[in-house]
Amino acid sequence: MIHAGQSSSLTPAASPPHRRGKHKIFIGMAPGVGKTYRMLEEGQQLKQEGFDVVIGLLETHGREETAQKAIGLEQVPLRTMIWQGRSLLEMDTGAILARSPQLALVDELAHTNIPGAEREKRYQDVELILAAGIDVYSTINIQHLESLNDLVYKISGVVVRERVPDRLLDEADEVVVVDVTPETLQERLQEGKIYAQDKINQALQNFFKRQNLVALRELALREVANNIEENSRHDQQTNHCAVHERILVCISTYPNSIQLLRRGGRIASQMNGRLFVLFVAPTNQFLSKVEALHVETCQHLTQEFEGEFIRQESDNVVGAIAQVATTYRITQIVLGESRRSRWHLLIKGSIIQRLMRCLPTVDLHIIANG
């Protein structure tokens, strides 16, 4: 359950070793709002109170104030890895587990590990640490949430490649929004507190435009507020609650399938419903390597959203969708706009029109392409 801005959720050392650690996430609208500084500040306070606190991974990005705030906190040595002939540093999850502190501070939750590491993403390392009974404080920016990827692109024009599943926010014991005004953040940028001098003008003209920051700030505040409301609503429900929404996303080999899947994932999350994703493959027709990889990506993304991926072979797309909708008791279907020609639509009708006739009690969400 998420509690924005509550006191420390740290668990005393006397707790049984088999318990899961507690996770507190510091989230903000953009780099430079002060997430890492706030995390270190709370870590220092807990150390003074007698808790065993270590830094598992810290990214100061050359910010002197942040580095100063880490002084006095034990830092677990990083692990050196060789990749493409270069020596690079990564968080040493094994060393953190062996050290077994009460609390580990881990920066940049969305980071992608070096190829060859035991786990692909840093958040997976954090989940391992939590499973060992160690509490974790971590940081992330709102644009790294998987389901918001398309929306962030529309706001900023930036494609965010490092992403985490939304469930991390849902499963966190506490989420704290580290908030500053867009004007304050732009001032920090101009003072060289976020990026090097040679990158400041470019940042101000792109991601750090005032209108972008206003929209991202609203997005961060609204997302956490929605999570609090959803968790509160979930706590009030009993095991004998009414019928849950069951959302079916229909994907194809077109690139917009990723957008459809994210939209369906958000609908399922907001309605506390179950997510199903259907791919109907034509019979006696092989997918190209690119198409097969695309479908595999959709399947992986479905797992990130904790949904169920369904693959069927059929030349009757409408019939296959209707059958799955009936079998899985689907209440809502998410589809993309039809790409067929006007002549085809005039002769056979659109998939949407035919589905409306087949499934009159199911709500259809038609998502525009682009």
UniProtKB/Swiss-Prot annotation:
PANTHER family: SENSOR PROTEIN KDPD. Its EC number is 2.7.3.-. This is Putative sensor protein KdpD. One of its GO terms (cellular component) is membrane. In the C-terminal section; belongs to the universal stress protein A family. Member of the two-component regulatory system KdpD/KdpE involved in the regulation of the kdp operon. KdpD may function as a membrane-associated protein kinase that phosphorylates KdpE in response to environmental signals. One of its GO terms (molecular function) is phosphorelay sensor kinase activity. Coiled coil: none annotated. Residues 1-22 are annotated as: Disordered. Keywords: Kinase, Transferase, Two-component regulatory system. Residues 1-12 have a biased composition (Polar residues).
